Amino acid sequence: RGLGDVYKRQGVEAVRTRIGVEATGKPFDAINVSDKSLVPEHFNPMVNAGAILLCTMLKGDSYSERFARLLELIRQLADNPEIDVDEAVFRSERETGFKNRALAYLLKAHGLFKDAVEDVLECYFRACSIRVCSRDLAYIGMALANHGRKFKTEERFFPAEYARFVNAVLMICGMYDG
């Protein structure tokens, strides 16, 4: 969801310097990394480490603004202004997200982002808690399949090149456990 927006704003190559596209073959929340595996190309946006890094790249002066932009994009893609955060899920993520917190501190310790970890995680946990229905997902998928254009109106959200790249990442990296 946010990947297309980040590509649109920064370009594919700029994003690829910070977030990779390699399938990990590991669980989505894996922390078992070594110093030589702590490089951006190993953190695709379909696993927690890559998604956390993606949150640092969203546009906005604050993380609340960054999240608001992401949520608005999802609402537009899904043609559903009612999409919102499931607050119970968000609170649970924030209160029990110890592995994600450890992972974020590890990423920061290795210089992969400079922002305050808790600000980044607030955005990440909120993004993980967005409640959508199957229709919403279908509309978002249609925008990607329709080369970055909205399903009903053909309004362009991002260039076809970015939609192709997001689709490729979904196909290659979306099956993270094998």
Q: Where in the sequence are the language-model features?
A:
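Active-site-proximal alpha-helical segments within enzyme catalytic domains
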Residues: 131-150
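Catalytic-loop motifs flanking and including active-site residues across diverse enzymes
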Residues: 1, 46-53, 133-137, 162, ...
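Short, conserved, surface-exposed binding loops centered on an aromatic residue
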Residues: 129-132, 158
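Generic alpha-helical structural context detector
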Residues: 56, 105, 139-142, 168-171
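Short, small-residue-biased leader/transition segments that mark boundaries at the very start
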Residues: 2-7
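Active-site-adjacent helix/loop patches that line small-molecule binding or acyl-intermediate pockets
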Residues: 8-127
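Conserved SxxK-family serine transpeptidase/carboxypeptidase catalytic domain
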Residues: 151-178
